[in-house]
């Protein structure tokens, strides 16, 4: 794949994230890289103090460094900043870090030599995963500690995470000395010159990669939420009137309009919907009898005299809630796409006039705010799903058997499965607290306001896992609810979703172990199987327009 600095698309970043895509730098970037490197070389040979070239760092910026020590200065910088702790970052995150750092440096405003970019791409293309601890960055001045660990591996002093056989690991494996791994792959360890160490660790590539990692992981989960939410509407015999396009056009919120469209398409052709329309009493009319033949005991109660005027919010307001979440994800995807293409080094080198300007592009506040928006959206998708589960098991609202058990009392049904969903939804509410509003001064108050973007993005993965489990429980519950409406059928799309679950999870006429069923369904939610059901529907709007990812 051709890496075009400043012009990366989100679907290209997704391909990098997925792996197996060798990267080649656009040759058009080379002149700019050479020009900015010449400016740095001249500064290193000159008498003027230039931050990051011949001075100390942070609070020590006023300390002048002798010319003979400039290379050692950069090496010391990397070694001293390798202070991360915690679990290793996953391989997809490292792939994005390597690629976006190479693309940023290749913009030609960092003053590094081409060999720096070449080494980043060589490590990426070899499938190597530098060992980078996940904790230790406050998101300004850049993601210093994690990028230092990544850089140390390029120098042959750090570590790579590999399989026992010596093959690159997909985020798991054993840690091996970087020098040996580079030698096995015939990659020369990088030797730093003036400013290059600073350029490699000053930037927002870790927090951006973590946020992209979450964005890509949540896409199939959100698609699953739409399908499962629609299945719940049918299981509860909810109305499809709230999805009428005229309602949503009057508000004009794009995510809401698109989500309502999805629900209409998912519910189209449902025999349950049609029977609901036939059985709902008209104003002033008495109860109508249930249809003859094949009526189950609970079905007769459902069909006979369904006098509900409005559905609960968890059914009726799904376009408003999930649509707003979709809008936030679209906003975040735009921020992250710009950040992945950005130059977030400091100081910046402008070869056209030889200027080297100190600024603050390393401050990851845009990423922090985008990640916080994603956290709220992720939490809300899970929160409304938990409410739908609660509605399904409450027979006074859903008019299904209590806890979706035909012999409630002897059987507890989905009683405690809902408790698990409530627990996970509560966890997400706590984790959704905005990280960006927190700041602690560092570097003796020189770096006195920071973004906390790295944590803001890193906490998204466990939140997504929680939502996937909540949706898995809802899927099980909604499918069980559909069983009580047989022989009526849902729409073709929703019957496909029901059948997909039934391939590994049978109906539950009596109590049994549910935990394996939850894990099975959660794997399908994560894996995009329900998104495939959604994408097969004709005429759907693209959910990921801003991300240049179409359904």
What are these regions (language model features)?
Residues 118-125, 145-148, 152, 223:
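A broadly conserved amphipathic alpha-helix scaffold signal in soluble, globular proteins
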Residues 51-73, 80-103, 133-155, 172-174, ...:
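FAD-binding core of FAD-dependent oxidoreductases
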């Amino acid at each position: 794949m051709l890496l075009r600095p400043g012009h990366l698309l989100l679907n290209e970043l997704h391909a990098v994230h997925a792996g197996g895509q060798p990267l080649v730098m656009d040759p058009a970037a080379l002149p700019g890289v050479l020009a900015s490197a010449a400016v740095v070389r001249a500064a290193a040979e000159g008498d003027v103090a230039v931050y990051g070239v011949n001075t100390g760092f942070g609070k020590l910026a006023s300390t002048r460094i002798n010319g003979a020590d400039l290379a050692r200065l950069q090496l010391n910088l990397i070694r001293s900043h390798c202070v991360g702790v915690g679990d290793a970052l996953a391989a997809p995150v490292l792939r994005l870090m390597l690629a976006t750092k190479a693309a940023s440096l290749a913009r030609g405003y960092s003053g590094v030599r081409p060999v720096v970019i070449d080494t980043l791409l060589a490590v990426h293309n070899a499938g190597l995963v530098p060992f980078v601890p996940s904790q230790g960055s406050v998101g300004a001045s850049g993601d210093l500690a994690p990028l230092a660990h990544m850089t140390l591996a390029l120098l042959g002093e750090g570590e790579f995470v590999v399989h026992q056989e010596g093959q690159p690991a997909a985020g798991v494996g054993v840690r091996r000395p970087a020098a040996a791994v580079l030698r096995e792959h015939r990659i020369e360890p990088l030797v730093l010159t003036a400013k290059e160490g600073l350029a490699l660790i000053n930037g927002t590539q870790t927090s951006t990669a973590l946020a992209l990692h979450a964005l890509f992981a949540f896409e199939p989960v959100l698609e699953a939420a739409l399908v499962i939410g629609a299945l719940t509407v049918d299981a509860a015999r909810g109305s499809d009137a709230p999805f009428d396009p005229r309602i949503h056009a009057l508000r004009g919120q794009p995510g809401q309009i698109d989500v309502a469209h999805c629900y209409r398409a998912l519910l189209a052709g449902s025999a349950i919907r049609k029977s609901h329309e036939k059985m709902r009493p008209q104003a002033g009319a008495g109860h109508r009898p249930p249809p003859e033949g094949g009526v189950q005991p609970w079905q007769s109660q459902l069909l006979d005299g369904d006098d509900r005027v409005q559905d609960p919010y968890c059914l009726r307001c799904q376009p408003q809630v999930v649509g707003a979440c979709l809008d936030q994800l679209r906003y975040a995807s735009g921020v992250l796409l710009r950040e992945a293409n950005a130059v977030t080094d400091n100081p910046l080198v402008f070869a056209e006039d030889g200027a080297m300007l100190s600024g603050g592009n390393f401050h990851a506040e845009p990423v922090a705010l985008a990640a916080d928006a994603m956290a709220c959206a992720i939490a809300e998708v899970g929160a409304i799903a938990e409410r739908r589960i609660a509605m399904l098991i409450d027979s006074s609202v859903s008019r299904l058997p209590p806890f979706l058990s035909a012999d409630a009392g002897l059987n507890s049904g989905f009683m405690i499965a809902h408790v698990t969903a409530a627990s996970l939804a509560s966890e997400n509410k706590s984790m959704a607290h905005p990280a960006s509003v927190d700041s602690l001064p560092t570097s003796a108050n020189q770096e006195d306001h920071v973004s906390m973007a790295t944590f803001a993005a890193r906490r998204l993965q466990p939140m997504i896992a929680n939502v996937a489990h909540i949706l898995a429980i809802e899927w099980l519950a909604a499918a069980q609810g559909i069983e009580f409406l047989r022989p009526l059928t849902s729409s073709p799309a929703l019957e496909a979703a029901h059948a997909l679950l039934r391939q590994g999870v049978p109906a539950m006429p009596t109590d049994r172990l549910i935990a394996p069923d939850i894990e099975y369904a959660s794997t399908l939610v994560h894996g995009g199987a329900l998104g495939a059901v959604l994408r097969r529907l004709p005429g759907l709007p693209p959910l990921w327009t801003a991300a240049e990812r179409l359904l």
